[in-house]
Amino acid sequence: MPVLGPERRLLASLSSAPPAAPRLGLAANQTNQTGPQCLEVSIPDGLFLSLGLVSLVENVLVVAAIAKNRNLHSPMYYFVCCLAVSDLLVSVSNVLETAVLLLLEAGALAAQAAVVQQLDNVMDVLICGSMVSSLCFLGAIAVDRYVSIFYALRYHSIVTLPRAGRAIAAIWAGSVLSSTLFIAYYHHTAVLLGLVSFFVAMLALMAVLYVHMLARACQHGRHIARLHKTQHPTRQGCGLKGAATLTILLGVFLLCWAPFFLHLSLVVLCPQHPTCGCVFKNVNLFLALVICNSIVDPLIYAFRSQELRKTLQEVLQCSW
């Protein structure tokens, strides 16, 4: 956990850091060379805490609602539940990290450097693992929806509970393993490129599947329109509504995740270039966007379900 230097987030250590302080933030890489004036967005600790707490509450409610309602005990909602757990871990790690850093800076918590380093490693693994698992479950949800549309009659024989369980177990195991290796070898170029390639693969998978689903939905809409002789209004409505949904799904994904992975790419491509250094200075902003994704995910993938919203109301009533 970097307690020195201008960068306060754990994943700031993903950059190439100076030998004297290998776990400091990206801004520590900057030298006294003349370069372009940089716009650095400062993210207050209070904002990190607020985002983490909002995400924490949202995702706890999603998990509680799915656990309470047996009608939601299906592979589709299990994937949504695991996505909520992944986002929950992102929130928990962020809240814990921010709280510990504030206590250390205020002198209210005394800890040896070795203890802080071990805590740093644990937090790094937790954050990286939750990020990897979150991306995996976003892809799994896309695959599940694709199968439900294109193989509707065979869906329940293809996506069974045992298969979904094995997929979920594999994702969690792979996330823990990959995050551990990533933190251990974060200074290797191949590791950073592997993580960036994984993000690009997930983006391509989601884009291909959702675009294909949109095309099938519009094709089905045109078929219905021909039967009712209302072709043009239906086609236009299908295109606008489908494009809006697709824009929300992929737009939010890109907005929240792409800046962070662009940052990793630049760490590999131009670690010492002044212009890239301007990007490095905003790593806290990129991590805040990742946390924002944990807030938006329940709104897109969970709360749109009428059954889940009804159960959520029951959970809230019981809590009061």
Swiss-Prot record:
Extracellular topological segments: 1-40, 97-121, 187-194, 270-282
Single GO MF descriptor: melanocyte-stimulating hormone receptor activity
GO cellular component terms listed in the entry, alphabetical order: cytoplasm; plasma membrane
Membrane topology per record: Multi-pass membrane protein
Cytoplasmic side: 67-75, 144-166, 215-243, 304-320
Secretion signal, residue range per the UniProt entry: none
Pfam families, alphabetized: 7tm_1
Residues carrying sugar: N32
Keywords: Cell membrane, G-protein coupled receptor, Glycoprotein, Membrane, Receptor, Transducer, Transmembrane, Transmembrane helix
Location of this chain's protein in the cell: Cell membrane
GO biological process: adenylate cyclase-activating G protein-coupled receptor signaling pathway; regulation of metabolic process
Effect of A243T: In allele MC1R*4
Transmembrane feature ranges: 41-66, 76-96, 122-143, 167-186, 195-214, 244-269, 283-303
Subunit details: Interacts with MGRN1, but does not undergo MGRN1-mediated ubiquitination; this interaction competes with GNAS-binding and thus inhibits agonist-induced cAMP production. Interacts with OPN3; the interaction results in a decrease in MC1R-mediated cAMP signaling and ultimately a decrease in melanin production in melanocytes.
Family affiliation: Belongs to the G-protein coupled receptor 1 family.
Record function comment: Receptor for MSH (alpha, beta and gamma) and ACTH. The activity of this receptor is mediated by G proteins which activate adenylate cyclase. Mediates melanogenesis, the production of eumelanin (black/brown) and phaeomelanin (red/yellow), via regulation of cAMP signaling in melanocytes.
Annotated protein name in UniProt: Melanocyte-stimulating hormone receptor
Organism: Sus scrofa (Pig)
Lineage: Eukaryota, Metazoa, Chordata, Craniata, Vertebrata
Gene transcribed to yield this protein: MC1R
